[in-house]
Structure formats: structure tokens, C-alpha cells
Amino acid sequence: MREMKHSKKLAFAVLAAVTAVGANVNPVDAASVVMDNTNVVTGANNAVAYGSGNTVKESDANFRDRDYENEPDDATKRTGDWKSNSVAIGVNNTAAGTSALAMGNSSKALMNESIAIGHSAEAQRTWSTAIGTRAKASEVRSQAIGYEALASGYKSNAIGSSAQATNNHSVAMGSSALASGDHAQAFGAGAQATNVRSNAFGSDASATADYAMAIGDHANATHLNSIALGTGSTTSEATAQSSATIAGHTFGGFVGVGSAANGSVS
């Protein structure tokens, strides 16, 4: 009787360390839980794979934060062996590295602390997040949320169906919004901010010059430092004005001289 009790305790201890339930499951390291069919855990500790065809594995590459604004990716890449606390739930998902989470169908969280949730969602780099069908976050600290949303710039954010934030620190919010300039921001369905620190606010608003700003539906700012303010407004090249007529009265002798560098407000 004493020997039987000892055997039960030993069996329970083994089960607590590695749990495998289902057909063709493959737990490898300590404290992993693998359930259902054809799930694979390779070289990972404290891993969880639940569903069918999921893979939890170690990662030999990750990225650190940048020390300065335009530090190249090659300088921030680190090599090593990261392999604990990752989770894959659903069908054919992959979670790699440390504390990665992949949920849905064919989603991939490929580096430390990355999150991919949805059908074919991909979080490709460290601290990236992709949520939604075919959403993709492909840079460090990038976030893509929505159907086919894409965040491919460092610390970029794309939120909305087919929204795209493709440069460093860019933000695109709204269906088909596009922020492709460095530090660009596009808010609204179809809004576009394509140049350095350009800003577009409103449906189909467009800012296509450096430091340009478009505010209002279909507003269009196309000149350096210019502002298009109001629905359908556009900008023009800044020019020198020596006089102006107000309420029938002409005023002249202006000292200020306009220039393209100073921009215009329309």
C-alpha cells in the first residue's frame, strides 16, 4: 500500500511537469501543456499549445529598442535563445520566443512578447501586435488592428480595415487610411498623409507635402508647411503680397514677404 501511494505521487509530479493529451502531440520541455491533435512544442519551456497543428518553439533572434531615431535594424538585432511562456491556441498557429501569443487560424507571433490574433494575423517582430484577419505588424513595437491592417514602421500604428502605417512613428486610423511619411498621421476613412510629419484629418483628406496639414473632408494640402482648412479646401504656393483690398479699401506697403518655405493657409 505504501509503495502504491508513492507511485501515485510520482505519476502526478510527472503529469504536472509535462501534459500531453491527444493524437500526435509532442511536448518536449518542462511545464508544457499540449492538448488535442498534431501540436508541437520544440525547445520551449512553460509552453501551451491547444487545438490542432499549432507550434510553440524557441526563437534565436529578437530586437531591442532603438538608441536613436534612425538607428538601423541591423544594429538593434540580438541573437540568443528565447523560449519560455509562449502560447498557441486554435489551428495551425505559431508562437515563437518568450511570452508570445498566437490565437486563431494560421496566425504567427514570431518574436518575444509579440501578439497575433485572427486568421493569418502576423506579428513579426519584438513587442509587435496584429489583431484581425490578415493583419500584419512587421516592425518593433508596431500595432496593426483590423482586417488587413498593416503597420510596418518602427512604433507605427494602423487601426481600421486596410489601414496602413508604413513609416517610423506613423499613425493611420480609419478604413483605408494611409500614413506613409515619417511621423505622419492620417485620421479618417481614406485619409492620406504621405510626407514627413504631414497630417490629414477627415474622410479622404490628403496631406502630400512635408509638414503639410489637411483638415476636413476631401481637404488637400500639397505644399510645404501649408494648411488646407475646411471641406474640399486646397493649398497654393505662398507668394509675396504687397497690398490687399478689404471692403473696398486697398492697403499697401506690407513688410512681410511670403515664401514657399513659410507655407500658406487656405
Regions picked out by a protein language model, each given a short descriptive name:
Residues 1-29:
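Bacterial Sec-dependent N-terminal signal peptides
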Residues 27-266:
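Periodic small-residue-enriched repeat registers in elongated scaffold domains
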